[in-house]
Amino acid sequence: MGGNYSVAIDLGGTIIKIGLILDSEIVRFTTISSDSVKGLSHMLPKMEHAIDSLLSEEGISSTDLVSIGLAFPGMVNPVECRVISTNDKYDDACDIDLCHWADSRWGVPFVLENDARLAVIGEWLYGAAKGTGNVVMMTIGTGIGTGVILDSKPLV
């Protein structure tokens, strides 16, 4: 099929959601159980397998993949592509170079951001908050997070 596909990963405390995206649309989707107390390094091979399966199901190869984004449930430094702090989930994440992981495995750029911030950006760009300049979102799952859009800009 070919194209400019991206992978979106929502790293939850109990479930990891992985979507294959083309032109801002989810074309394939899967979930895997998270064993977050064992750490992120324990989950990376399972995430790799899930991503490769999505590519295979879509009939494309990794050369059609242009980026991977990961929503992390904790404090991150997106510029340095590093997890800064975790909340008793994925405790080893601060020691993992996720940009290197994505580059060495698929040869694509990797974007890391806080999960609540990405959730509010998604609603602001595509969902219920589309067209508004100020949005506050609280995410409640295994943990609690907040994301804010202020004067049409994500608050960081």
Task: Show where each model-derived region lies.
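Short glycine-rich, Thr/Ser-proximal phosphate-binding strand/loop in the N-terminal lobe
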Residues: 2-49, 83-85, 154
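Short glycine-rich anion-binding loops that position phosphate/pyrophosphate groups of nucleotides
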Residues: 14, 73-76, 141-143
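Glycine-rich phosphate-binding loop of actin/hexokinase-like ATP-binding domains
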Residues: 130-156
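Conserved active-site "lid/cap" helical segment
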Residues: 43-62
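Glycine-rich phosphate-binding loop and adjoining helix at the ATP-binding site
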Residues: 37-45, 64-68, 74-134
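Short glycine-aspartate micro-motif
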Residues: 6-10, 65-69, 135-139, 145
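A cytosolic small-molecule/anion-sensing beta-strand core signal
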Residues: 22, 66, 72, 150-151
